[in-house]
């Protein structure tokens, strides 16, 4: 099992200062001797619901402990990277920053991935009671491979302790087609008979491996 930062940038408040953060992060990665390994760091290929077309970062660490340590206790990161200008990271960018644990090796070149950050529950009863059972049937049909679907180990900055979903498809196009399919939109999301945005707010992004 490995640890991951899964980060959805919501907004960049100070582009110049944030650009300096990104440059410093590149140096941090180089100096980490492979401990900190970005496996995706770009805007998503597609967004849905409350998804935002801003940087979507997946950073791999050898273990969950390494991922937590790097973000919370490594001064090389929070002093020399995100707070190098002497101000909190929140002054420069708003990020839904979560730390999760899952098996390594899931990111495969050419495959497509749903990365979904639940930001808020509005009608949790219908979501859990009706939509999630339909989702389980959808997954059981081999529609996709689920690598993570639960709250994170830790949430920081603008992160939330709500479920984070990581689902794999054979290709980017397959991931997009699945998101736009009747099987997902009607049979799963429509299981409660009400619009998704009346039950849950999700930052839904699709990326390519």
Q: Model features per residue range: what roles?
A:
Residues 1-72, 92-182, 202-209:
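Short S/T/G/P-rich N-terminal loop/turn motif that feeds into the first structured element of a domain
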Residues 76-94, 183-198:
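Short arginine-rich
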């Amino acid at each position: 099992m490995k640890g991951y930062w899964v980060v959805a940038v919501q907004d960049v408040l100070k582009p110049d200062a944030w650009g300096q953060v990104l440059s410093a992060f590149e140096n941090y990665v180089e100096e980490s001797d492979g401990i900190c390994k970005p496996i995706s760091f770009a805007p998503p290929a597609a967004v849905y619901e409350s998804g935002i077309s801003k940087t979507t970062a997946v950073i791999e660490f050898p273990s969950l402990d390494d991922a937590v340590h790097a973000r919370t206790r490594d001064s090389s990161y929070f002093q020399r990277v995100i707070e190098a200008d002497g101000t909190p990271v929140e002054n420069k960018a708003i990020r839904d920053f979560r730390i999760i644990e899952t098996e390594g090796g899931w990111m495969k070149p050419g495959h497509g991935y749903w990365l979904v950050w639940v930001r808020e529950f509005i009608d949790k009863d219908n979501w859990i009671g009706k939509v999630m059972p339909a989702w389980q049937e959808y997954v059981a049909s081999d529609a996709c491979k689920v690598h993570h679907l639960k709250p994170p180990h830790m949430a920081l900055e603008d992160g939330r302790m709500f479920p984070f979903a990581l689902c794999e498809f054979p290709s980017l196009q397959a991931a997009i087609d699945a998101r736009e399919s009747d099987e997902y939109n009607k049979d799963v999301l429509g299981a409660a008979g009400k619009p998704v945005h009346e039950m849950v707010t999700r930052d839904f992004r699709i990326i390519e491996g």
